[in-house]
A protein has these predicted regions:
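Generic alpha-helical structural context detector
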Residues: 38, 64, 106-109
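Hydrophobic or amphipathic alpha-helical targeting/insertion segments
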Residues: 81-88, 93-110, 185
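Aromatic/histidine-rich interaction motifs
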Residues: 113
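Nucleic-acid processing machinery
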Residues: 2-27, 41-49, 56-69, 78, ...
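N-terminal glycine-rich anion-binding loops that anchor highly charged ligand groups
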Residues: 31-38
């Protein structure tokens, strides 16, 4: 199969995927991934997505999410490339098992079963369905690849008809975003929610997006002003930190507006500050509290808004210290404090532990 002639654009996309894991896995695993890519390419050859592009770009995108955004290993990357092969081609599960092993075949089988259940899941309540997905799978890779699959489908949803887009977006909101949350995949959860809102409430989505854009410079200046004394003191105390200011997600702002029946201007915490300390695991808890003390020396905290997930992590593994303080000009600001290890878990979810 190594003599296979693959179009330049597809090959370029595959090479981009390889760069995300090339220094993390051995030569044998790389060969296996190449074999799974070539198998998927032949299985989907000539098939196009609704957007008109070759179907193989979808499994390539899913594999890249799995490797780069979730941080999984070679088995998951291989299965992400093959995830639609049994469902959409003549290739049988036995063939997958023979070529790629029992573990890979079980994951592909799990992914195929989930697709079948979703097709007939109209009457199943979202919460029951989420529980069923979690218990259905002996291997967490199945759920994580399914989330990556849904994320790519949401990113490319624009090519579908409006009714179909709304249906998929609603399903994403009630099933997949909470599932990502349950597994601690906060970045993926947030993106799924924002993309779902874009198709379920497009007017609200674009209104909030536009206003966030319009207030970008003002927000950046405020964050700079807020952080100035903190940065000086943190450095003086000898902490090595990275500090980021980021706007809250469009979905979370919309949720607050709806719940409190207020407009965009009245949402008091439209952004959050994240302080990540480069501490050794032995000192990370005390360092986070010391940084908390520095922040609250400058800005008065709201005691009702303190969340200590360092002493008691969330069930999905999330660890962080959250506080809301009164910043300059009487604005409330949310501050999240965590170590690099905690941040890795917050970004990659429980996958950071398991795989």
């Amino acid at each position: 199969m190594s003599n296979l002639i693959i179009p330049k654009e597809i090959l370029k996309t595959y090479q981009s995927l390889v760069r995300t894991f090339s220094n993390k896995i051995n030569t044998e695993e790389k060969k296996e991934i190449k074999k799974s890519f070539e198998t998927a390419y032949l299985a989907h050859k000539g098939i196009k997505r609704k957007s008109g592009e070759a179907y193989i770009f979808h499994p390539l995108a899913v594999a890249k999410i799995v490797a780069k955004e979730i941080g999984l290993g070679s088995l998951a990357i291989k299965c992400a490339l093959l995830h639609d092969v049994v469902e959409d081609s003549e290739i049988k599960l036995k063939e997958i098992e023979k070529k790629f092993g029992k573990k890979a075949a079980n994951i592909i089988d799990g992914l195929t079963k989930i697709s079948e259940i979703i097709g007939s899941a109209n009457s199943i309540q979202a919460e029951n369905f989420r529980k069923m997905l979690l218990t259905l799978s002996d291997d967490v890779n199945v759920i994580l690849i399914k989330l990556a699959d849904r994320l790519d489908n949401m990113r490319t949803l624009g090519a579908l008809k409006d009714q179909k887009r709304r249906k998929i977006a609603s399903e994403t909101l009630y099933i997949y975003a909470p599932l990502a949350h349950r597994l601690g995949l906060y970045s993926i959860k947030t993106e799924l929610e924002d993309l779902a809102l874009k198709y379920t409430e497009p007017e609200k989505y674009f209104e909030i997006s536009k206003k966030l854009n319009e207030t970008k410079t003002e927000r950046a200046n405020y964050i700079k002003k807020f952080l100035k004394p903190i940065k000086t003191k943190v450095k003086k105390e000898g902490f090595l930190v990275s500090i980021k200011g980021r706007p809250k997600s469009i979905f979370s702002i919309r949720k607050k507006m709806a719940k409190q029946e207020i407009n965009f201007e009245e949402v008091f915490d439209k952004f959050a500050i994240r302080i990540i300390t480069n501490s050794k695991e032995l000192n990370e808890k005390s360092d986070c509290w010391k940084i908390y003390s520095i922040v609250t020396d400058y800005y008065k905290p709201n005691p009702d808004r303190l969340r200590d997930w360092i002493s008691t992590p969330k069930t999905n593994g999330y660890e962080s210290l959250h506080t809301t303080v009164m910043g300059p000009d009487g604005h409330w600001v949310e501050v999240q404090i965590r170590s690099e290890r905690m941040n890795q878990i917050a970004e990659k979810g429980l996958a950071a532990h398991w795989l």
